[in-house]
């Protein structure tokens, strides 16, 4: 077997616009929320910051109590958007394992005065790049007592 490399192939970097992402995600969210308005499982859907902004602003999300965003591409900036969302203020369970969260992002989050997720009972952050000190800082924060 031989492999030939070379050539002048050109590849386009196609990144959909925010509006296109919002439209596509709304088409996914609508039937899921109609089926179960209190629980939403979006694990492994390549959700990153733009998609989190759509989720944060999508009014039907107000009824969701349990949100599974595990195994996605959620970073520290997206984490801020989730926790500062008025629409997601009723969340009781948030699953964020296997994402791109860091200890620094968690430390910045606990310092925020804009946190709206006051009803959280379950927060899963396993398999992220979190430090022991950032977890301790979160546990001692008034936001998470």
Language-model features and meaning:
Residues 1-145:
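Leucine-rich tandem repeat or coiled-coil scaffolds
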């Amino acid at each position: 077997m031989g492999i030939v490399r070379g050539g002048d192939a050109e590849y386009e970097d196609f990144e959909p616009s925010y509006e296109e992402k919002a439209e596509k995600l709304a088409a996914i969210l609508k039937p899921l929320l109609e089926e179960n308005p209190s629980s939403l499982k979006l694990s492994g859907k390549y959700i990153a910051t733009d998609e989190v902004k759509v989720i944060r602003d999508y009014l039907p999300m107000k009824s969701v109590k349990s949100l599974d965003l595990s195994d996605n591409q959620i970073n520290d900036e997206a984490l801020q958007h989730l926790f500062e969302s008025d629409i997601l203020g009723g969340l009781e369970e948030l699953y964020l394992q296997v994402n791109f969260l860091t200890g620094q992002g968690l430390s910045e989050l606990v310092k925020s005065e804009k946190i709206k997720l006051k009803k959280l009972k379950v927060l899963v952050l396993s398999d992220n790049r979190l430090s022991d000190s950032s977890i301790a800082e979160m546990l001692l924060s008034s936001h998470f007592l």
